[in-house]
Amino acid sequence: MADGLGLPRFRTRASRMQLIKSPTRFYKAIESIIERAQERVFLSSLYIGKDETDLMDTLKTTLSKRPALRAIVLVDALRSTREGQFRIDPVTRRPNTSCASLLASLTRDFPDQVDVCLYRTSGLPVWLEKLIGKRVVEGAGLQHMKIYGGDNEFIMSGANLSHDYFSNRQDRYVHFWDQPLLSNYLISLILLCGHFSYRLMAAKAVEAGKEHPHHSAYALQWDGSNSQLLLGEADDGTVNEGGCHIAALERQPLREHKFAFDAGKLVNAFTQRWRQHCEEELANYNNTQVTNDEDDDNAAFVVPLLQMGPLNITNETDAMPRIFEALRREGLAADMPGCLDLTSGYFSLHSPYKSLVLDAPSEAFETRIVAAAPESNGFFGSKGISRHIPMAYTWLEQKFWKAVQRRGKERSIELLEWVKSGWTYHAKGIWWTPPRTRALGPTHTLIGSSNFGYRSALRDLECTFLVEAPQSGQSCLTHVLKEEVNDLRHNATVPVNDALFAQDDRKVSWGVRIAAELIKGRL
């Protein structure tokens, strides 16, 4: 598949991947990665919770101990500055804080060790934020990649870095270690995105001589390649101080609000460059590796799928039809169905994906979908207009189920809702199990930030890994993926059917229906 799409394909070992099973372990794993880092820390998230001072203290302590350590952080500008500028209320003396003010304390305390970059979707006029509010403008597009790493290890996830994601919000997390090439790829990706983002600069203290230990006033400075980040990608794909692969940018800096076309060209060049690095690495492996059947049986592959609609980067939407076609061929050839599992905390399938699911022949594979029940939606019980979002997803879910019924696919397409008392559901992913390994488990999975909806396809910056388990089907990774699917399905206890939508609490008002249709491209 990587060859057909012109994408890099990384060879690794299944024994160097581990699924993390709970939010609390996810937090501990991130802390440990930061504490172990000797040379670099790289973090990419939608935002970091403004109260995550313990996590920032871990990073600050590690930076203090290791002056040679460098860190790069990439977050979304709109989401991270939603609360406004850092200030201290003159009456209550309480500070007004945000993700940006939290991270600004990093650049204030470690200006020679830390870069913080805030991505803001191209083409959005600043006056629009003031007219309708940042939270509404966020629907136009966000930096959504979730990558948390240090040195040659990292966690690929769909979770952000805030309290709910560390306690009672179900997501997915895969820890990769001893991965120098993949780690270089990811940090290079973050650095590249940093060059068409804003640099976060700590501003003058709010009150002379009175700096907040965990927050700072800040300013945003457009990069556009005008400034040199602390780290850069070298010609051989390694990342170090002084490495820089933006020569084209230096000749013509990116424009602040009109960078999408040029940034897209840079991402395409990045992808081709890394495809070449992977080919060279594989050739070196084949030339030097003594034949080892045990090692070959443990070989797994990772294909990063970048989806950046505003930049016209469409790896995921290009790959999805090929994934479904591969399952179709295997299922029909085996004369017995395979299985495709799909889950999203925000179930609003991109129209082409919806068609792929509905058009798939029942004799080739069955599809099992897990979505969040309304009370498991992260917006359930919120204030303001966002309180209607769970019912908007209910309406889109009902429309999908009606389409399943019109196709007569109720027996081959199963839709369940996930419910766990006191928890919300944020997991997203796809697993597919061909007929030959039906008893053993999935041979492939998609793990990352994409929710497979309209937003993921068209508006946000997404990075999702297509992971290929060893082809023997006997790999520990295959068994672990099967266990992961079963664990997620354990709380998927609400079957979606006509009886469910007939319940009073599932009746969607006409106002929400109309609004859902109008804004579904932003959900």
Describe the function of each predicted region.
Residues 1-109, 113-146, 150-523:
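Charged, low-complexity intrinsically disordered terminal segments
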